From Swiss-Prot:
Genome polyprotein of potyviruses undergoes post-translational proteolytic processing by the main proteinase NIa-pro resulting in the production of at least ten individual proteins. The P1 proteinase and the HC-pro cleave only their respective C-termini autocatalytically. 6K1 is essential for proper proteolytic separation of P3 from CI. Residues 1-45 are annotated as: Disordered. Belongs to the potyviridae genome polyprotein family. Disulfide bonds: none annotated. One of its GO terms (cellular component) is viral capsid. It comes from the Viruses. Keywords: Capsid protein, Virion. It comes from Passionfruit woodiness virus (strain Tip Blight) (PWV). This is Genome polyprotein. Residues 9-36 have a biased composition (Basic and acidic residues).
Length: 269
């Protein structure tokens, strides 16, 4: 027979043998896709390792002391490694110490930290500062003692304030956007370029993103601020007593109390 009954849902569809043969011939005419050999290699571009064992690396008894895989992935935040910035633990200790001495909550400390940062922008972070620092409550000045801020700052207050560098820079940018503004540190250094106002505070942290011009301005301002500063290793020792005995005899005819005659000459009559 030339007809084939297709067993489907209703069993009534009829397919001719001719249609089946034509479909088979079409499939034979198509070429099969070639299988990819799993063992074949493509012409890939070679990648060189940035750090190889052929370098002159530190060795102990023939064993390399570096873990190269870890070293390649080790890319910490640069500023976290600066020894000019207090560590996170030191900053936390300073914060908790100030909060305890001021007897404030965390929310209240957030309000205190803002004006203290602005005060440091204007007045600097010298270790010699003392007395009080001032914040403004509307038109009213509110004074706070500086002692907790300075005494709890380890190693120094400037190293603590380096944590505020980015926030202080953004604050100065905001002030400059609303009108002419130059921090007092820049006014004392006679900084004339208003575009560099964002760098005119003494706890600015120079980093890889700082432009060459700004870095030069920061270095010049720091050199000018420290030009007349002398650090003495030892101060005056107050525990000094005279233990020598003066046995020299003097008369009224001596030139002075330390000299009998002046090159053989007596005292003038």
């Amino acid at each position: 027979k030339d007809e084939i009954i297709d067993v489907g849902a209703d069993g009534k569809k009829v397919v001719s043998k001719k249609d089946t043969q034509d479909a088979g011939e079409v499939n034979k005419g198509k070429e099969k896709d070639k299988d990819v050999n799993a063992g074949s290699k493509g012409s890939g571009v070679p990648r060189l390792q940035k750090i190889t064992k052929k370098m002159n690396l530190p060795m102990v008894k023939g064993n390399m002391v570096l873990d190269l895989d870890h070293l390649i992935e080790y890319k910490p935040d640069q500023t976290k490694l600066f020894n000019t910035r207090a560590t996170d633990a030191q900053f936390a200790t300073w914060y908790e110490g100030v909060k305890a001495e001021y007897e404030l909550s965390d929310d209240q400390m957030g309000v205190i930290m803002n004006p203290f940062m602005v005060w440091c922008i204007e007045n600097g972070t010298s270790p010699d500062i003392n007395g009080v620092w001032v914040m403004m409550d509307g038109d009213e000045q509110v004074e706070y003692p500086l002692k907790p801020m300075v005494e709890n700052a380890k190693p120094t207050l400037r190293q603590i304030m380096h944590h505020f560098s980015d926030a202080a820079e953004a604050y100065i940018e905001m002030r400059c956007a609303s009108g002419p503004y130059m921090p007092r540190y820049g006014l004392l250094r006679n900084l004339r370029d208003k575009n560099l106002a964002r760098y005119a505070f003494d706890f600015y942290e120079v980093n890889a993103k700082t432009s060459d011009r700004a870095r030069e301005a920061v270095a010049q301002m720091k050199a000018a601020a420290l030009s007349n500063v002398t650090n003495k290793l030892f101060g005056l020792d107050g525990n000094v007593a005279t233990i020598s005995e003066d046995t020299e005899r003097h008369t009224a005819r001596d030139v002075n109390q330390n000299m009998h005659t002046l090159l053989g000459m007596g005292a003038p009559q």
